Amino acid sequence: MKTKRFLSCLAALCLTGALLWGLTWLTQKKDSYAKHAEFFEQRADYDVFFVGSSRPMNGIFPMELWENYGIVSYNWAQAGHPPPAYYWVMRLALDYKQPKLMVIDCYGMHFDAKTTGVFGLMHISMDNFPLSLTKIRAVRDMLDDPSMTEEYNEGERRSAFNLLWTFPVFHSRWNQLTQEDYRPIRNY
């Protein structure tokens, strides 16, 4: 009897987990995955990674480097990112590829905050990386700042839980879902 009850509970937990995983996948915004799909699809290593804020994001063009110099590069820069945020994006990217060179934007060294004022930008940078020990460390470090736990205008509470599991953030997107949301994510 105990074995049957244990197996029933285990099956219920597995079904609940699968349902939550599917709902999370369906309701989350796919912009992070779309933006960084090529990074995960690239088979060979990159020559150069660029990390930083809007300056390298808007001023460095990997395709130009490829066409003009044969340099394979990837631009991880994100608008509004202070150095701690792009440090962790760099660490997460290094779990997948090993470039010969890292170019780091030093513009924001004078900022005190560990994350951007617009928390949605953190989702664009972090959501595309699968859950890992490095991602957990990154989220814990970036949110280890009292000013980052406040609720901001966009309404999302700044919590590690919301960056590690996106369903609580995007669960109300039902009326915004499109055909694109039902298609598989290429790099996940």
Predicted feature locations:
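Short N-terminal helix-initiation segments at or just after the protein's N-terminus
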Residues: 12-14, 42-50
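Acidic/glycine-enriched edge-of-secondary-structure segments
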Residues: 19-28, 72-80
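Membrane-embedded segments
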Residues: 51, 55-145
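Alpha-helical transmembrane signal-anchor/signal-peptide segments
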Residues: 26-46
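A broad, low-specificity signal for short, low-complexity segments enriched in glycine/proline
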Residues: 7-14, 33-38, 62-68
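Hydrophobic membrane-insertion alpha-helices, especially the h-region
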Residues: 4-25
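Secreted/periplasmic serine-hydrolase-like ester/acetyl group-modifying domain
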Residues: 119-188
